[in-house]
């Protein structure tokens, strides 16, 4: 009895502090299809709960009766944002990619990827994560599944890496988005020489071929094509999971893609 009483009054052990690092989300919004006013509330609630350091968004749209989706989410979250589109400012409809962050922005940029005829972009923010600069990039590569699509994605990856080399300096790099390619696809082989797959690094013992970021409600075959890549000599993936992989109501989904969340740790 005395031992039990003594144990009862011992102070609770403090939780182990997490090692310095950052969290990242990537998510294809499916633009304004299928009840965007309802979907955006579902997306907002999840992002509010997660409070990621940075968010990469694809298929972001802005139309006369649809406020820029990245701007709306950033405003509700209290985040800064960078929207990138090949559609010029002032155009009645603009479509592109975006980065959102709750961290101070040290630099920002954008780039139109080669081949220019495919109208693909990359957004860049350098953010301050508790005194550590980190470069985050968001992109969305060509969607074709044939040989020509692979060739185009290969060209886009080469141009993306060239842009990163010109803008990243010495700070760690995270690249997120909808790559329309499996992580081991030849299209991504050059990128994978230096950048790790956050989800695959964490779930090494799982049957990754059965994991899909395409919503199985819309697509029959599993396909993990949405990725968060991290610079392997600067960062380590500690946690990763899918987001929005359950309906928020019967037959209602946040998007035709699932999101990906990852927690990255700065390498010692």
Regions found by a protein language model. Give the residues of each.
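N-terminal, active-site-proximal structural segment of metallo-dependent hydrolase catalytic domains
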Residues: 2-76, 89-93, 158, 263-268
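Sec-exported extracytoplasmic/periplasmic mature domains
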Residues: 48-52, 74-78, 105, 165-169, ...
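Metal-dependent phosphoester-hydrolase catalytic domains
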Residues: 165-173, 181-268
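Active-site beta-strand/loop signature of hydrolases that rely on acidic residues for catalysis
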Residues: 22-29, 43-66, 100, 125, ...
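Active-site-proximal segments of metal-dependent phosphoesterases and phosphodiesterases across multiple
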Residues: 140-160, 183-192
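Active-site neighborhood of phospho(di)ester-bond hydrolases with catalytic His/Asp-centered motifs
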Residues: 56-58, 82-85, 174-178, 197-201
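Short, solvent-exposed loop/turn elements at domain surfaces
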Residues: 31-37, 109, 207-209
């Amino acid at each position: 009895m005395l031992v039990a009483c003594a144990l009862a009054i011992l102070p609770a052990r403090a939780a182990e502090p997490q090692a310095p690092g950052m969290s990242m989300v990537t998510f294809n919004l499916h633009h304004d299809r299928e009840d965007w006013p309802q979907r955006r509330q579902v997306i907002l609630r999840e992002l509010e709960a997660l409070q990621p350091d940075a968010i990469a968004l694809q298929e972001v749209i802005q139309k006369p009766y649809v406020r820029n989706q990245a701007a709306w989410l950033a405003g509700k979250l209290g985040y800064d944002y960078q929207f990138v589109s090949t559609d010029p400012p002032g155009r009645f409809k603009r479509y592109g990619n975006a980065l959102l962050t709750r961290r101070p922005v040290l630099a920002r940029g954008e780039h139109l990827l080669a081949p220019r005829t495919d109208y693909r972009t990359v957004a860049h923010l350098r953010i301050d994560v508790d005194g550590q600069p980190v470069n985050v990039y968001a992109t969305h590569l060509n969607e074709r599944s044939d040989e020509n699509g692979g060739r185009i994605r290969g060209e886009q990856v080469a141009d993306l890496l060239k842009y990163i080399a010109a803008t990243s300096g010495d700070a760690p790099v995270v690249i997120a988005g909808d790559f329309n390619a499996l992580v081991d696809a030849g299209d991504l082989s050059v990128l994978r020489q230096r950048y790790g797959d956050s989800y695959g690094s964490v779930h090494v013992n799982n049957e990754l071929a059965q994991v899909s970021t395409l919503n199985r409600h819309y697509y029959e075959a599993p396909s993990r094509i949405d990725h968060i890549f991290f610079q392997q000599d600067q960062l380590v993936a500690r946690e990763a999971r899918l987001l929005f992989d359950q309906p928020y109501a019967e037959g209602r989904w946040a998007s035709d893609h699932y999101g990906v969340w990852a927690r990255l740790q700065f390498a010692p």
